Amino acid sequence: MVLSNVKIFRLKSHRAFRIGPMIKAVAGNLLVKRFYQPKLERIPPASLLLKQKIRLAQNGSTTSTENPISFSQTMSEIFSVLQPSAPDLDEDKTSGLKRDHLLTERLNNGELGVIMNKFFNPSSTHNNQLIDTNILLQNFPKLSGNDLDLLDFAINEKMRGNWNDLKQDFIQLWYYKSFGFLGPRTQFVLTNSSPSLRSQFLKLPFTEYNWFLLQNNKNANILPADVQNVVKVFHLDDKRFTWKSIDPFSKAIISFVVFVSIYVWLDESAKQKTKDLPAQKSTVISE
């Protein structure tokens, strides 16, 4: 019996000696996983984030009936009863996220490059592959609504990054989409010139004219058919932002705000003085 007990004790101690390091290793791994979290350098793709937003929006719309009714939800239900034709905000949000997800997939699949090569064919004669002006003017109106939506989405997405990484043909198309033929220019027409209007614009095939460039030019001959294409661009100067040019209602609001600010400042200063007087009296009595 004594020998058997000794063997059992040795066997148990041997097992404990073998299990002890295993427990320490497992505990060490748990501590490492608990307190050490490696930083992932890989950023999740935009399409995955959009899918997550769509799923959260749909889950929020389905579980909103289970949550307690809030004040905003009650007001939205009241307005929906009063205005049945008003659009649903949740549906608009979900449809907008689905649209962004679809445009992201189209942009990642290289559809924008296919459109640019199909309609504009950037010339390889230039160093930075610029689009020929005549091709740009002729083929840009041929873009469909889906193509323009993809172009606008690409502009909004790529403008957030480094502009030095953008290609010149994309910048040229972005510029034309934003500003048109004339671009953000202020002085283009000579005031003392007598030739026809199109020659003053360097003989470029413009189809619309900037009204600001022509308002001081008395020698410019504009045909009646071209008047419909005139774009009115108002030039803002310092004279517009004067006290005399402000309407009476705005003056009254500004004066009221200034009066209230002065009244609050005087009231706070008076309260501060009344608080300081007892402190001064206590110091005098103590002396």
UniProtKB/Swiss-Prot annotation:
GO cellular component, one term: mitochondrial membrane
Keyword Mitochondrion: yes
Domain of life: Eukaryota
Species assigned in the record: Saccharomyces cerevisiae (strain JAY291)
Major location (coarse): mitochondrion
Segments passing through the bilayer: 250-266
Designated gene of the protein: GEP7
Disulfide bridge positions per record: none
Protein name stated in the entry: Genetic interactor of prohibitin 7, mitochondrial
Keywords, in A-Z order: Membrane, Mitochondrion, Transit peptide, Transmembrane, Transmembrane helix
UniProt membrane topology term: Single-pass membrane protein
Keyword flag Transmembrane: yes
